[in-house]
Amino acid sequence: MADVTSMGEITAIAARIGVDLSQIDLDSIHLPPGEDCGIPSDDDDLMEEDPLEFDAGFGNILVVDNLPVVPKEKFEKLEGVVRKIYSQLGVIKEDGLWMPVDPETHKTLGYCFIEYNTPQEAELSKEKTHGYKLDRSHIFAVNMFDDIERFLKVPDEWAPPEIKPYVPGENLQQWLTDEKARDQFVIRAGNDTEVLWNDARQLKPELVYKRSFWTESFVQWSPLGTYLATVHRQGGAIWGGATTSNRLMRYAHPQVKLIDFSLAERYLVTYSSHEPSNPRDSHAVVLNISDVRTGKVMRDFQGSADEFAVGGTGGVTGVSWPVFRWSGGKQDKYFARIGKNVISVYETETFSLIDKKSIKVENVMDFSWSPADPILALFVPECGNQPARVSLVQIPSKEELRQKNLFSVSDCKMYWQSNGDYLAVKVDRYTKTKKSTYTGFELFRIKERDIPIEVLELDNTNDKIPAFGWGPEGSPICCYPSVTTPRPDIRFYSVPVWALTPGLVSKLTTLKGKQANALYWSPGGRFLILTGLKGFNGQLEFFDVDELETMASAEHFMATDVEWDPTGRYVATSVTSVHEMENGFNIWSFNGKLLYRILKDHFFQYLWRPRPPSFLSKEKEEEIAKNLKRYSKKYEAEDQDVSLQLSEQDREKRKKLKEEWEAWINEWKRLHEEEKMERQKLRDGEASDEEEEYEAKEVEVEEIINVTEEIIPFEESQQ
């Protein structure tokens, strides 16, 4: 902006240069549009005023249909109900709620108009209240007023839609058709994310896709392996396809920190927390449940972190994660969350509470779903004179199937078997003196009549058990370590079928003094790894439970994580960047043979790609098991070919190294021959390259470099 010059200054300047302003017709001077030469005009203040805003269109007006038709006496009550619902979602303008009335009957017409301050508030209200159930007979149908014009343009006569040619999408399960039946895994090291094949035959991984800055924190496979999820500041994204490099959908959720899939991959839960403006307040939490395929937000939950911090373990800002736990099965029909004195169970058909109310359970501490059936297991700790209890509740009827009271309980953990046949409840109880605790087990046989409960008797009643694990794939074998000593005992038990052996839980064996602090079952059962991680420096023992024998013992120094591949053929051990050295991973066979080792700086994540359950029937699987020798001939031949190929590659490698060595020797001989005359010259013309016997002599040569004469006075010499 130009400097402002007053009229007095202009007059002074004119007098100094000899110009008489009275002789000049200022009205005849025409300035360019918008130019005032630094002289303020009288109307500048008017020009600087904010322009008036006028409402354009009807984007801030809603039309709410399917309201009750009521007489004049109930008009104010209905208007109050509607105003209460919609004023929570935005600011309604003065006289912004209009409910038309039939002039003859003086009854409402079943719809109303609502005017908000902004179109954004109207859009939000439409999204939140469309389909709102006022009662069983009145479900709101909400539209924008602007949509009426669009509806009027719909032609009266139906015209058949244009049929577009079908374009098949990419097969998202293509990775399962690998001819070598290999499995994939993803790793994160530094800023790079890599998806690789585990090519155990070639004793190395094969790269599928690599990308830098693919995610801002971590990656996560969906439960069936169809999608790979990444996390960004703007929200989450899922990827899939042959190379896992195609982005399939994005989910807007600013500052998302955690994600979780439903078990059947139909829904994605995204979580974010935000710092409160008042330090005394807790973090604000936002949870969105989105449809995986369409990206549509089916329901969102908002509140303080305190509302989502009851029960569970892990998470951020005090929130237990996952907040929502999904029922077992292939339909993702129910999900639930724990609250203060309630369990809230929702159905995904409407994303509302079952029967519009939560299950009230005073002082409830934890719950878990059966992996196979819509059954909830609830744990309620002791409160006053009321004993602790574990209850089984059927959903959606909310009927209590079984209950067991527990006394002197310090802690309780529930462990479902993978196919939902058994529930093990690990109970830590106080001793009579209340100075220590001991562990016991209650086993619920879910599939048996009346759900009988059996107590697992321990050899040493003073044992405290930190870990427990069911054998997978329907195996009834469980084990746990005792930590009464630094080298715990590992014990194995068999849980027989109730109908055949009533009331018997038999111990199979005890492994004495093992250097282990964690157990990892193979997904296929039978095999497990006894691991001594972190403080035990990566001790590994590969154990066959059927034969009750150790197959191999090994070590992965400083190992922090162990993960079986989904088939149970291979296992990965890794050292993450919590240690500064030896970052990377090892791939082992199920029986403890080290196949290959990969070192990666700043390595911090390793995940096998899950596989969906087998589509084969039990009869077909039994048939394959019977004819396994016949089927295995093909794979044995392939293994033999690969072995021969590897041997040939090794021979070629050794041959190449030999040729490189011989080439180096020949080059050395050539240079030696070229320098022969020079060596002979240095040896006073004597050709001595071929001499085998020689005598080394050490010759000393004295050479006077400088002579200095100094005259010393006689008096000094006498002194």
Swiss-Prot record:
Residue ranges constituting the RRM domain according to the UniProt record: 60-147
Assigned keywords, A-Z: Cytoplasm, Initiation factor, Protein biosynthesis, Repeat, RNA-binding, WD repeat
Subcellular location: Cytoplasm
Disulfide bond positions: none
Region (Disordered): 675-698
Function: RNA-binding component of the eukaryotic translation initiation factor 3 (eIF-3) complex, which is involved in protein synthesis of a specialized repertoire of mRNAs and, together with other initiation factors, stimulates binding of mRNA and methionyl-tRNAi to the 40S ribosome. The eIF-3 complex specifically targets and initiates translation of a subset of mRNAs involved in cell proliferation.
GO BP annotations listed: formation of cytoplasmic translation initiation complex; translational initiation
Subunit structure: Component of the eukaryotic translation initiation factor 3 (eIF-3) complex.
Compositionally biased region (Acidic residues): 687-698
Keyword field contains Cell cycle: no
PANTHER family: EUKARYOTIC TRANSLATION INITIATION FACTOR 3 EIF3 -RELATED (PTHR14068), EUKARYOTIC TRANSLATION INITIATION FACTOR 3 SUBUNIT B (PTHR14068:SF0)
Ranges: WD repeats: 167-207, 511-553, 555-598
MF (Gene Ontology): RNA binding; translation initiation factor activity; translation initiation factor binding
GO cellular component: eukaryotic 43S preinitiation complex; eukaryotic 48S preinitiation complex; eukaryotic translation initiation factor 3 complex
Family named by the database record: Belongs to the eIF-3 subunit B family.
Primary localization: cytoplasm
Listed Basic and acidic residues bias regions: 675-686
Protein name stated in the entry: Eukaryotic translation initiation factor 3 subunit B
Coiled-coil features, chain-numbered ranges: none
Top-level taxonomic group: Eukaryota
Gene source species: Nicotiana tabacum (Common tobacco)
Pfam families listed in its UniProt record: eIF2A (PF08662), RRM_1 (PF00076)
